[in-house]
Amino acid sequence: MPGRYCIWAIWLLMAVPLAAAPSQGDTAQQPPPSTTRGYTVFLGGAVVGREELTVLTTADGLDIIGKGRLSGSQDLVINRAEVRYRPDWTPEVYELEASVNGGDTLLYTSFAGTTAVTKGVDAGQQVAHTDTVPPQPVVLPNVFFGAYEALTRRLASGAPAQELNVFVGFGAQGSLRLLSTAAELVQIGTSTLNVRRYALAYAGPRGAATVHVYADDAGSLLRVSIPAQRIDIMRDDLAAATSRTVVYSNPTDEAVVIAGAGFNLGATLTWPASARGSGEAASAKAAATRLPAVVLLAGTAANERDGVVAGVPILGQLAGALADAGFIGVRYDKRGHGQSGGRAESASLGDHADDALAVVRWLSNRRDVDRERIALVGHNEGAWTALLAAARERRIAGVAAIAAPSATGSERVLEQQRHVLEQMKVAPAERVAKIELQERINTAVMTGRGWDSVPADLRKQADTPWFQSFLGFNPARALEDVRQPLLFIHGELDDEVPILHLDRLGELARKAGRSRSVAVVAVRGVNHLLVPASTGEVSEYASLKDRHVSAEVTSAIREWLTKTFAPGR
C-alpha cells in the first residue's frame, strides 16, 4: 500500500481533465486512425512535465500509448504507458513502465468482466491485487494524463453518460459526474479551432475536485484542467503563447499579429461592415478610402483583448459599436498574456504605453488606415496608458478616457481599500491598521525603504515594476504633456471609480492648458462596466440583466470621434 501511494497520492488530483468539444447532441467527426502529439504539464503556471502520446483507432478498439516525465516533489519518468479498450469501451489492458526517484515500477492490469487483476512491481514492492470493477470504467491513471483521450472520445461520441466510473489503479477507484458542456472557440495564431469543454465533478479515494476536459471536433484530447489544484495539461499547440480562448467576437473581427518591442502582440481588428470584402477590388477600395481607427486599451482588471470585467467584454463590445459607426477598432492582449509575447511581471505603465504606440505605428503603415485619424480609447487605468502614449506620439489624434481615475496611483489604492473596508463593515481599529499597512507598502514600493515592516508575502506581491509605476503615476502631471483633444466619459453610477473623478479630470486638463479641446460627459444610469445598473455597486454585477455596453456611452464616443476627426480640426 505505501508503494502504491508514492506515485498515486502525489498526482491523484492532477489526473482529472479540462476538455473542449462540440455541444451536446452534435455528432463528432471521425478521429484519424493514428495520431501522435505532445502535451505540456503545468503546475501553477510553471512547466513541470511533458507527455508524448500516440493514439491508434482500429476495428479492435482504441489503443492509447505514451511516455513522459513529471518533475516536482518526485521525479517520475514514464518509459511506457498503455491503455487499451475494446470497441464497446470495455477496458482490456493497462500497462505502466516507470521509475519514481530512480525506483522501478512495472505494472500490468488486465480486465475481464467485473474483475481487474494487477501484477508487477511498484517502487520495488511486489504487487498482486484483484479489484472488483463496474462495467466499462474509464481507466485514468494519475501518472498518465494521456489516458484522458478515452474520456474525451466517450464524451464526444454521442449523448454522454451523466456519470462514469473511474479505475485509477489497483485499489483505487472513483467516479466522474458530468456537470455541463459548452462550445468554445480557441484561436491559434490567426486560425480558430472549435472545441467543447466538459465540466465534471470527480470523487475518489483521496478527495473530490471539479475538473474540465477539452476536446476537438473528433473528440481528441486538447486539455485537462483542475483549477483548485492549479494544474493544466495542454496539447502543445494550445500551450504555446500563440493560443487563446475566444470569449467574444464581432461579425467583422479579423485576427492579426502586430510587431512590438522584440515580441508580437496578438490582436483583433474589427472592420466596418462596409469595408469588408475580398480580392483586388476590395484592396483597391480600402486603399482609396482610408478609414479612421481607434486603439482600445483595457484597465488593470482585464489583461486580454476583449477587456472582460465581471463577464462583460467591454472592449469587444466597444470595438463592434465603433465599427458600426465606420471606425476600424483594434484591441490586443497585454504583453505576457493571451497571444502576446513579452514578460508581464516586469512590465510598467510606460511599457504598456510603448505597446500601444506599436499598435499606432502598425496602423499608420496600413494602406487602409488614415494615419491622421488614429485615436486611443482607454478604460479605467487603460486611460492612463493612453495619456502616456499620447504624450509621446503626436500622430495620435485624440484620447478618450473612460471611467478614469483622477488621483495618483498611491491615492487610488488607498481610496479603493477604504471603500472595500467600509463595504465589509470592518471594525474601526482593524480598518485603521489595514490602511496604515497599505501606506507602509506604498512607501516601501516607491522609496525602496521600510520593507522590514511589511510581511514577506505582501512584499512579493507588491514589489514589482508595474505596481511601482502605478503608484507613482500622476494624471495631473501626465496631462501637462498631452496636446491632443480629450474626452472624459464616466457612468454616474460608477462605484469603483466614483463620478467625482470625472470633474476633477476635466479641471486638471483645462488647468494644464495644453489640449486643444476638453470634453466631459457623464452618462446617467451606467456603472463602471458601462452597462445599465440600479446601484452601480460591485455586489450588483452578478445580477445585472443587461450586460451590453450602453448605447449612450458608445454614441458619446462616436460623436466625439467624428468631431475630432473632422477636416480642419
What are these regions (language model features)?
Residues A358-V426:
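Primarily recognizes the serine-hydrolase "nucleophile elbow" in alpha/beta-hydrolase
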Residues L164, G398-D481, K511:
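Accessory cap/linker subdomain of secreted extracellular hydrolases
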Residues V482, F488-H490, D494:
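Short beta-strand/loop motif that positions the catalytic acidic residue
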Residues P32-S34, V48, N101-V195, A199-G204, ...:
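Solvent-exposed helix/loop surface patches that form functional interfaces
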Residues I314, S346-R367:
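Alpha/beta-hydrolase active-site loop
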